[in-house]
C-alpha cells in the first residue's frame, strides 16, 4: 500500500532543501566582484552590437579569457601552482642579445632564402632536405634552454635536487654512451638508457672558454636504499679545464647505474657547474675504487650550498633507467652484496559487512565471506 501524500510531503520537506531556500542562502554572501554579462542590458537585445563574424567573436572570447577575474577557476581550486616569480634562479644570467639585431638576422636569412632558386625548385619538387644539425643548433641557441628547464621541472629535478630553486641550462651539455665500436646512445632530457648501455663512463662535450673551469656531477635521484632524501653519486669530475673532460680531477670514480629490481624507473642526471676559481673538493673526495654505498651517499643541495660562492649550475642532461640483467652483476661483483628485490604488495580487497539477508544479491555474494577459496557458483 502506498504511503499517504501527507506523510511523503512531511518527510520530504525534512530531508531536502527547496529552491527558495537555496536562493535565499546564496544571497546572504554577495559576490566579490561584477558577475559575467552584468553590464549587458537584456531588456532590449535588438540594440546590442552584433559580432557579424566568428573571427570577431573568437578574438573577443580570447581577450575575455585572458583578462583577470575575481573568481577562481577549476584549476585554481584543485591544483596549487607556485608562482614562477617566487622561485630563486641560481643559474647563469641570460645572454644579452639585441632584439634589433635578431630582427635584422631573420630578415637577412629570409631574403637569402627567397633569392635561392635551387631551394625554391627543391621545395616545389618535394626534394628539399632539412639540415637537422643546423636546426638543433639554432634550437640550442634560442628556445632550447627554456624547454629543458620545463622538462626538468616536469620530472621534479629542481624540486628534489635544489629544494625548489631553478636555473636555465644555458650551456648545451652533450652526453653519449659508447655501445660497441661505432654506436652511441645519447642522453637527452628524459629518454631511457639501460644499465647495460651505461656500464662505462660516457663521452661528455660542451662549449667553453679556454681559461674556464667546470665541475661535472652524475647522480641517481631515486636509488638510495636507506635514506629517501639522499642520492647516490656515480661520477664526480672537478676543476675541469675548459671542455677537456679527461683532464679533470676524478673526485669520485664512475659507477654503473644499479636501479633495484622492481623499483621502477630511476632518474639519473648530469649536472654541469661553472667555477669562478679553482676549488678544494677534499670533503667530497671518494677513494678509488669506491664500492661502498655508504661512501657514495650524496646530497646535491648540501654540495651546492658548500660551494655556491665559487660555482654556478650551467648545464643539464638526464635520462631514465630501470633494472636489467647487468644490475645483478653490479651488485654481486662490484658492490659485493646481495641484490635487493622489491615487489608491490596490493592491499586486500575491501568488503562491507556481511548482510544476514542479502536481498537481490547474486549467489557469488557469499564467496566474499567464505574462509575457503572454493567458489559457491556452480555447486548448487
Curated annotation (Swiss-Prot):
Location relative to the cell: Mitochondrion
GO CC terms, sorted? cytosol; mitochondrial inner membrane; mitochondrial large ribosomal subunit; mitochondrial ribosome; mitochondrion
Enumerate the Gene Ontology biological process terms: mitochondrial translation
Q: What is its main location?
A: mitochondrion
Keywords recorded for this protein, A-Z: Coiled coil, Mitochondrion, Ribonucleoprotein, Ribosomal protein, Transit peptide
Listed Gene3D superfamilies: PEBP-like
Q: Give coiled-coil spans as residue ranges.
A: 100-123
SUPFAM superfamilies, alphabetized: PEBP-like
Is this entry keyworded Hydrolase?
no
A Pfam match is PBP
What residue stretch is labeled transit peptide in the record?
1-26
Stored InterPro entries? PEBP (IPR008914), PEBP-like_sf (IPR036610), PEBP_euk (IPR035810)
> What's the family?
Belongs to the phosphatidylethanolamine-binding protein family. Mitochondrion-specific ribosomal protein mL38 subfamily.
Give the quaternary structure.
Component of the mitochondrial ribosome large subunit (39S) which comprises a 16S rRNA and about 50 distinct proteins.
Protein's name in the database = Large ribosomal subunit protein mL38
**Species for this entry:** Mus musculus
* Gene name of the encoded protein: Mrpl38
Amino acid at each position: 500500500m502506498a504511503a499517504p501524500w501527507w506523510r511523503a510531503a512531511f518527510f520530504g520537506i525534512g530531508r531536502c532543501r527547496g529552491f527558495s531556500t537555496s536562493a535565499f542562502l546564496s544571497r546572504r554572501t554577495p559576490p566579490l566582484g561584477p558577475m559575467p554579462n552584468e553590464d549587458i542590458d537584456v531588456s532590449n537585445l535588438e540594440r546590442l552590437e552584433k559580432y557579424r563574424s566568428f573571427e570577431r567573436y573568437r578574438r573577443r572570447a580570447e581577450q575575455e579569457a585572458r583578462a583577470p577575474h575575481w573568481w577562481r577557476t577549476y584549476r585554481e581550486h584543485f591544483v596549487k601552482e607556485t608562482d614562477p616569480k617566487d622561485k630563486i634562479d641560481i643559474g647563469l644570467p641570460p645572454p644579452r642579445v639585441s632584439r634589433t639585431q635578431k630582427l635584422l638576422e631573420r630578415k637577412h636569412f629570409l631574403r637569402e632564402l627567397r633569392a635561392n632558386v635551387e631551394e625554391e625548385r627543391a621545395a616545389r619538387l618535394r626534394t628539399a632536405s632539412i639540415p637537422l644539425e643546423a636546426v638543433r643548433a639554432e634550437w640550442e641557441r634560442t628556445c632550447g634552454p627554456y624547454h629543458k628547464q620545463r622538462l626538468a621541472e616536469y620530472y621534479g629535478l629542481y624540486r628534489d635536487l635544489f629544494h625548489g630553486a631553478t636555473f636555465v641550462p644555458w650551456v648545451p651539455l652533450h652526453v653519449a654512451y659508447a655501445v660497441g665500436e661505432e654506436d652511441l646512445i645519447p642522453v637527452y632530457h628524459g629518454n631511457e638508457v639501460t644499465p647495460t648501455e651505461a656500464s662505462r663512463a660516457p663521452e661528455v662535450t660542451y662549449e667553453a672558454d679556454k681559461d674556464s673551469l667546470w665541475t661535472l656531477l652524475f647522480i641517481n635521484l631515486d636509488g638510495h636504499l636507506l635514506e629517501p632524501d639522499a642520492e647516490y653519486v656515480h661520477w664526480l669530475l672537478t676543476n675541469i679545464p675548459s671542455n677537456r673532460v679527461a683532464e679533470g680531477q676524478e673526485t669520485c670514480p664512475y659507477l654503473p647505474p644499479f636501479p633495484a629490481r622492481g623499483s621502477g624507473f630511476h632518474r639519473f642526471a648530469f649536472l654541469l657547474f661553472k667555477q669562478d676559481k679553482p676549488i678544494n673538493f677534499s670533503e667530497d673526495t671518494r677513494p678509488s675504487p669506491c664500492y661502498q654505498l655508504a661512501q657514495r651517499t650524496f646530497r646535491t643541495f648540501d654540495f651546492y650550498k658548500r660551494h655556491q660562492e665559487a660555482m654556478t649550475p650551467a648545464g643539464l642532461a638526464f635520462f631514465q633507467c630501470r633494472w636489467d640483467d647487468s644490475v645483478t652483476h653490479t651488485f654481486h661483483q662490484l658492490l659485493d652484496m646481495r641484490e635487493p628485490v622489491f615487489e608491490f604488495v596490493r592491499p586486500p580487497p575491501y568488503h562491507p559487512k556481511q548482510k544476514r539477508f542479502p536481498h537481490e544479491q547474486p549467489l557469488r555474494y557469499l564467496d566474499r565471506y567464505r574462509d575457503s577459496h572454493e567458489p559457491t557458483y556452480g555447486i548448487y
